[in-house]
């Protein structure tokens, strides 16, 4: 069963872990929506449907032919390790904590750094070349070539239109997307286009008190890690720098769609006193990966310009 980080925090009796999870979730539309599957081992091997069997109409007492067997792609999402040490000098902690809890502040900042790194690799992660990362959306969907789940503005990119955004939404099957993930520039453009059409953007309050805009009833998630410098040639991406384009992702989350996988969940480990230094260490670590269960549950719009 997949469970969100927010629910995991509620089930934890560790106050420090709860605080770290809440820090990671706040201001992260990705982690607020993404659910995680707890696995055993160092990766998740799963089958993704490729070809369905066929069905036929039959006359009474007629022979039934054998349908071709369904075809699957067997894929493996290997866990990657993301984390960092939060080191606190004992002198500073003891003499400067009258104004602010120094240790809590450093742990909070380290947790934010872990969140930022996860959000970046959620989009741009690439497991090849010894990076120690998992594969992100850009690689899983493959924005470098034509595909049924890739909508392109064409050529070297073009100004975003609502018609193309609607086309992106229609690439996702089995219900509406749970999230439209885009850069701040793309969000501003969508807002301007909706206003120009005479409509308005509906807004709802989130779990953490923040306000989320909706397009066609779908929450818009703003990612500070989606670049507006993607480059296109012939309608498809050739790189993520040197251009003036951005990508927008339409995503469904959960088992059977886009999900995370983890072994042990997000962990906060009090390492304790450091040898040779008058400091204490807390380690935040996460054995995590991204799982793309079904191609039809996510899509991407590329070449979006202002």
Q: What would you call each of these model-derived segments?
A:
Residues 2-87, 107, 130-131:
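Assembly/oligomerization interface modules of large self-assembling protein complexes
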Residues 34, 120, 126, 203-207:
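Short glycine-rich, low-complexity/disordered patches
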Residues 2-18, 225, 232-306:
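Extended, compositionally biased alpha-helical segments that mediate assembly or anchoring
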Residues 40-48, 52, 159-260:
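Extended oligomerization regions of viral-like shell subunits
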Residues 46-48, 108, 112, 183, ...:
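Hydrophobic alpha-helical segments involved in membrane association or supramolecular assembly
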């Amino acid at each position: 069963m997949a469970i969100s980080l927010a629910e995991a925090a509620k089930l934890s009796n560790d106050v420090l872990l709860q605080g770290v999870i809440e820090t990671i979730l706040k201001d992260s539309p990705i982690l607020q929506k993404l659910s995680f599957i707890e696995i055993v081992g160092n990766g998740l091997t799963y089958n993704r449907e490729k070809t369905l069997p066929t069905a036929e109409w039959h006359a009474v007492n007629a022979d039934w032919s054998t349908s071709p067997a369904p075809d699957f792609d067997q894929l493996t999402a290997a866990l990657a390790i993301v984390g960092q040490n939060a080191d606190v000098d004992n002198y500073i902690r003891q003499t400067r904590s009258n104004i602010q809890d120094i240790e809590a502040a450093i742990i909070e900042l380290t947790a934010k750094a872990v969140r930022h790194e996860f959000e970046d690799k959620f989009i741009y992660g690439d497991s090849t070349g010894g990076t120690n990362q998992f594969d992100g959306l850009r690689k899983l969907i493959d924005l470098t070539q034509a595909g049924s789940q890739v909508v392109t503005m064409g050529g070297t990119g073009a100004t975003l239109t609502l018609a193309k955004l609607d086309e992106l939404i229609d690439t996702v099957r089995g219900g509406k997307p749970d999230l439209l993930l885009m850069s701040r520039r793309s969000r501003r453009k969508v807002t301007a286009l909706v206003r120009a059409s005479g409509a308005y953007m509906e807004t709802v309050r989130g779990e953490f008190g923040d306000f989320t805009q909706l397009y066609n009833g779908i929450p818009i998630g703003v990612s500070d890690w989606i670049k507006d410098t993607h480059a296109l040639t012939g309608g498809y991406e050739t790189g993520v720098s040197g251009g003036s384009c951005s990508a927008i992702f339409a995503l469904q989350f959960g088992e059977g769609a886009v999900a995370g996988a983890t072994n042990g969940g997000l962990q906060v480990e009090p390492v304790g006193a450091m040898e040779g230094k008058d400091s204490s260490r807390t380690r935040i670590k996460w054995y995590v990966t991204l799982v793309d269960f079904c191609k039809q549950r996510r899509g991407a719009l590329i070449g979006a310009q202002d």
